[in-house]
Amino acid sequence: MSDTTFMKMNADRYIRMALEEDITSEDISTNCVMPEYQKGQVDLICKQDGVICGLWVFQRVFELLDDTVTFDMKVKEGDFVHAGDLMAVVTGDIRTLLSGERTALNYLQRMSGIATYTHEIAQLLEGSHTTLLDTRKTTPNMRLFEKYAVKVGGGSNHRYNLSDGVMLKDNHIGAAGSITKAVRMAKEYASFVHKIEVEVETLEQVKEACEAGADIIMLDNMTPDKMKDRKSVV
């Protein structure tokens, strides 16, 4: 199963929560002035240059409200679009289109923004041996979508959640007593398929983590020059 398939399978519960948060019992403004069963059309037009991301989420928002809504997509996921480009034509019940508009755009705009920024950084790293990774510092209930956007923009995902891998930070190391003890405990507890990553701040910690058998060394908040020095030890 691909990452995209997994994400799409798990997206509905979050999208439903977002719709419930915004609409609750009804869109009272729209229902005041729009008659029932009136068809309408919406043109989705790009406001600024960037990588488009989240088209399938945009579409799914409306589908969960009304499965008769139709979509004529003019661009593909991950395309670089320009201000003024027509990206999609959406046709359906006008009440549905107006009620779902904000939620659909919230997803599309946020995901496209992340994909665009990731794309800009990925271009700067082109030709190097550097992989651009994300973190777990995501917006609550948006992790699935934000991490997907990083991949669309040209980055890679680090841990998706706390069960994905062992990452020993300063708090874990402090509780264990040392990096060596923390790594040993992790090796005893975790499955052999889990890599053990250790966050370090000093040259001495880099050496200790390597000697302890850590699979990955994370250099925490270091300048490029300091990272070069630490890399030579590894």
Question: What residue spans do the PLM features occupy?
Answer:
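Positively charged, low-complexity, intrinsically disordered RNA-binding extensions
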Residues: 222
